[in-house]
Amino acid sequence: DGFSTQIVRLGGLLGDDRHPVKQLAKLPVVYNPQAPINLIHKVDAIGLLRYLADRAPWQSIYHGVAPWHPTKQDFYEQAANEMQLPSPKFAEDPGNANKVVTDPQVQSLGYAFLEPKLGLVQTP
């Protein structure tokens, strides 16, 4: 028999003690504030991997990202506020891409994200 596999490309991972705003708050500047975020919460990364292994066709590539894509600035300012951290400083970088990663296959397979708003109490 041939080798069959699934490839799952996960977005930036966050959850529990892992949150990118903790590192970004320490940087002198974060570029491209209007770019969308492409993140996934740890509980959804695990849940999606299990869900795909049980229900999805093999020999496919999937993108594991939350369905919500606010701008970097909106998301990280709100996250910093909720975590009582200093807000990152932002600057434009016109050469950077504004790519939203979605996966209609994941949506059509019916996975229900547990943390679609990536753990924020309030959304920007």
Pin down the residues of each PLM region:
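Mid/C-terminal beta-alpha module of Rossmann-like enzyme folds, strongest
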Residues: 46-102
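Short aromatic-enriched loop/helix-cap "lid" or pocket-rim segments at secondary-structure transitions
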Residues: 18-22, 75-77
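Alpha-helical substrate-binding/gating segment
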Residues: 21-29, 34-62
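Amphipathic terminal alpha-helices
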Residues: 97, 117-124
